[in-house]
């Protein structure tokens, strides 16, 4: 009897143990199945964008691109659609050789040239004589500076021919007429120093400066009014000199220097009152600072000069030859750093900016030099 009871208990224990083992296996299988389902559920969230992770039902229940769409059913705030704004057009750089150049230009000074006509011919030129090409981005910003007094007739011809030419050259430029006030002796180089400073006050972006006499008009638009690695002399073949360079060191008429080149030579001399000498002094400054003159081909650098009598109060400077010999010393103290003047008026005209200045008066001839 006891053996029978013992055998029965043994079978019962084995059965209970088997059931416990079976229960454990089922629990383990269910655990891993639930874990796999949770893992798959959360992996779907991790692959969505942050907006979808925060609002998983927004993309399917709300059409935010429609003005009358609503998110009330989902309980989410309405979000306006993010429409791409207009992109600014990419303006390419201006070509080295502008495509609209015509080459040789016929220049004549016989027909009347009213300023109103010149203004009608140049509708793209802004107030103050500023212009920038609409279809390309120039590499330089050019200030054209004209020393001036009592030459309104010449200025109208200059504006008539130069504005169309500069626009064909795809320049970003401004024209500044530096008008010497009063009837004291004329001082061309000092007016050019004033023009350099006043142009930079208006626009610090100027990095190229063209210094032009008002009575000189280029005969070829391939004579590009730009600055290069060396100072540039543009007017190398004037009709006045038989379309030849008068002498090797001549730097008169029309010239161009970058801002860095101009500052390197301390600008132009201020003490050349009257006609002559300042161009040769400028040439000496360029040579003494280790730079060389760059010039266009003689067939391109041709100019016509408007014939006129010599201006009153612009007599030849009797001290000019002595001064030229002393450039090495005088350029250290006489130049852009020592120029003194007073601006009387700044007037922005349709085709140019007129700056009237008082530049003082010369010392007596006995104390000059």
Curated annotation (Swiss-Prot):
Residues 1-15 are cytoplasmic. N-acetyl-D-glucosamine binds at residues 277-280, 320. Residues 37-369 are lumenal. Its cofactor is Mn(2+). GO terms for biological process: brain development; carbohydrate metabolic process; cerebellar Purkinje cell layer development; locomotory behavior; memory; protein glycosylation; visual learning. Keywords: Disulfide bond, Glycoprotein, Glycosyltransferase, Golgi apparatus, Manganese, Membrane, Metal-binding, Signal-anchor, Transferase, Transmembrane, Transmembrane helix. The keyword Transmembrane applies. It holds the Pfam family Glyco_transf_7C. Glycans are attached at residues 63, 68, 354. Residues 58-90 are annotated as: Disordered. GO terms for cellular component: Golgi cisterna membrane; nucleoplasm. Belongs to the glycosyltransferase 7 family. This is Beta-1,4-galactosyltransferase 2. It comes from Mus musculus. The gene is B4galt2.
